[in-house]
């Protein structure tokens, strides 16, 4: 399972890794917290457009299950409501590994460039960790979210300043780029995303092999 703030976040930060999981037969679920409605210009129904783009992008990396929670883009908060929605999905899908935003990223250095962190990313990451522990895995918490308690084996945090776990994505890199290209409303943004994805994959990689970086938390 990958939990992201916006459409295209999971593909940008972890698309190659997710493509590899799917290719190995894993049941991968994407959760997108916001509607992405402020992520572009010139389209009235930007949220609806981005929802369709996200479905196509997920298909490009072999993923059929996408949950869009529909929070307002730019105003995401680590609320009890968001936390409880994530608990419900974790218990429903019972993922062994959950990917999501690092909750404390205010900026990331990529070589000589600095990318400021998005407040929605931190909110999504905080809500995810609050959902995982102590609630999702305990019968004593959140009975209203239904399902049997579930505690993932690992959490991999992307969008991080200092990754300690790098995943080679040579086989999934083209699928990642194809997925990013499906976000057509972001052209100008998406073209930049593709270029940035190549640059970041090269920075994390070794011997010309592209990679993605995470902070890896082994929970059990």
Feature-to-residue mapping (PLM):
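Metal-dependent de-N-acetylase/amidase catalytic core
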Residues: 1, 65, 80-220
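Active-site rim/loop-helix segments in enzyme catalytic domains that contact anionic ligands
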Residues: 1-96, 215
């Amino acid at each position: 399972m990958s939990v992201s703030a916006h459409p295209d976040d999971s593909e940008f930060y972890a698309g190659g890794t997710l493509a590899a999981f799917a290719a190995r037969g894993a049941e991968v679920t994407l959760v997108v917290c916001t509607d992405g409605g402020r992520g572009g210009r010139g389209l009235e129904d930007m949220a609806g457009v981005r929802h369709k783009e996200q479905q196509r992008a997920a298909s490009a990396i072999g993923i059929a299950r996408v949950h869009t929670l529909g929070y307002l883009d730019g105003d995401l908060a680590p609320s009890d409501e968001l936390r409880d929605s994530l608990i419900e999905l974790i218990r429903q899908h019972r993922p062994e590994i959950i990917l999501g935003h690092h909750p404390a990223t205010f900026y990331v250095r990529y070589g000589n460039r600095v990318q400021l962190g998005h407040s929605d990313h931190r909110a999504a990451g905080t809500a995810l960790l609050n959902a995982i522990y102590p609630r999702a895995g305990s019968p004593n918490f959140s009975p209203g979210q239904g399902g049997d308690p579930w505690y993932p084996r690992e959490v991999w945090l992307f969008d991080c300043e200092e990754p300690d776990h790098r995943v080679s994505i040579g086989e999934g890199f083209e699928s990642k780029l194809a997925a990013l290209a499906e976000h057509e409303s972001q052209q100008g943004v998406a073209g930049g995303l593709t270029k940035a994805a190549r640059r970041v994959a090269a920075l994390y990689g070794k011997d010309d092999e592209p990679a993605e970086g995470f902070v890896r938390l082994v929970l059990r």
